[in-house]
């Protein structure tokens, strides 16, 4: 890969992939509004233990979405001993009753579409296209060494650790940064770029969700490349080999002895398509290794990967190609 496209890809990721500060702040405001609504509207007998930021917003791997369709995960946990029925006050509330209680507390006359109960959460909609998913947890033996949590789901209460992925991811980033400066930051950028690639053709491609892509990126990321163009190429290369061996994805945040499968089978349609699209991408990028590869060929190859709508062409025009350099 003789011609570097590191600066252009970093600029593209910062401008067109990563969330802007303005969008992030707006999402946080909506999250805080929901939290305030819950505090004000929940029954007095019910005591909140914590609000729990989850998902890609919490670990800073969220990307810009067409139409502003952002999905924020923000859980709420309750002291289990306070989740008692309103009339008798003796029986434990069921998972359905807790989700209904949370849904009612989140309702607001200002909403054009009121919150709805889903399998494992309550969803709050916003006119800008955003939605906030609010899962509910009960905390048993709170503030003791035996503390554990259960998620309110459609099938009842289920053991769950809502901060497990957050902790695992932050530890992974910190470990990478200790080994090599900015390796953790590059890891985050690679996840966001992989998500952008997966969503670059919209509904034309059937792609796995962000959690599966994050777990695959963790398996396939190599920290030895300072350049983001090389790092992403080898992420795709390693991912292609990984999917050739197996298309099953595991939750790597869990202990190895008890990991849950995130896929349903070896041949989930979205995993099969991901493998094919990664293979296609590597074929497009083969030209980068040619001795006679030109700057325009490099630009066109990367534009095919991310479907940038002319961003790289504009970037090169503004910078007169000064970001390119020969690589040893």
Enumerate the language-model features and the residues they cover.
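Conserved nucleotidyltransferase catalytic core and NTase-mimicking acidic/glycine-rich helix/loop elements
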Residues: 182, 186-293
């Amino acid at each position: 890969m003789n011609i570097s496209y590191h600066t252009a890809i970093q600029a593209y990721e910062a401008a067109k992939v990563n969330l802007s500060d303005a969008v992030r702040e707006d999402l946080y405001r909506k999250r805080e509004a929901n939290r305030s609504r819950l505090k004000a509207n929940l029954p007095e007998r019910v005591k909140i233990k914590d609000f729990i930021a989850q998902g890609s917003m919490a670990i800073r791997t969220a990307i810009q979405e067409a139409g502003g369709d952002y999905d924020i995960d923000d859980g709420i946990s309750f002291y289990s001993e306070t989740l008692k029925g309103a009339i008798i006050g003796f029986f434990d509330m069921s998972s359905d009753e807790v989700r209904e209680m949370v849904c009612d507390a989140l309702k607001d006359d200002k909403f054009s579409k009121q919150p709805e109960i889903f399998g494992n959460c309550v969803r709050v909609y916003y006119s800008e296209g955003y939605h906030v998913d609010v899962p509910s947890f009960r905390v048993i033996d709170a503030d003791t060494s035996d503390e554990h949590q259960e998620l309110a789901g459609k099938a009842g209460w289920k053991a769950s650790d809502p901060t497990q992925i957050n902790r695992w991811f932050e530890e992974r980033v910190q470990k990478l940064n200790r080994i090599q400066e900015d390796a953790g930051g590059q890891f985050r950028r690679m996840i966001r770029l992989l998500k952008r690639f997966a969503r670059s053709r919209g509904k034309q491609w059937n792609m796995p969700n962000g959690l599966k892509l994050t777990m695959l990126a963790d398996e396939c990321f190599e920290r030895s490349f300072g350049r983001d163009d090389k790092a992403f190429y080898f992420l795709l290369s390693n991912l292609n080999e990984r999917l050739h061996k197996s298309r099953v994805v595991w939750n790597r945040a869990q202990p190895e002895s008890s990991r849950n499968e995130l896929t349903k089978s070896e041949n989930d349609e979205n995993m099969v398509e991901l493998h094919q699209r990664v293979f296609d991408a590597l074929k497009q990028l083969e030209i980068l290794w040619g001795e006679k590869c030109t700057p325009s060929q490099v630009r066109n190859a990367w534009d095919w990967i991310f479907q940038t709508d002319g961003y790289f062409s504009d970037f090169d025009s503004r910078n007169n190609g000064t970001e390119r350099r020969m690589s040893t």
